[in-house]
Amino acid sequence: MSPKLHASARKHFGRDRLTDESVLYAYEHALNSRPLDDEDDPRRWLVVGIDQSGRVLEMVVLYFDSGGELLIHAMKARLQFLEELR
């Protein structure tokens, strides 16, 4: 199941030349994911994935107890998150 994209997830689309499709592809092709905090509902996770052109993206996704998923942040991965892939 793919998450819904919140408007805030599109903040860096122009600068990083992202599209809804590239972000959802990267989400589906995650290389790493981890929780960002200890919250119960919604749970906030960092997801690092690769899009169709090989770019590594960082995304933040909210997972709700009801089963919903909302992607609230997407951009080209910063160095701090790339280093986690080593």
Spell out what each predicted region is.
Residues M1-R86:
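Ribonuclease/tRNase effector modules and their secretory precursors
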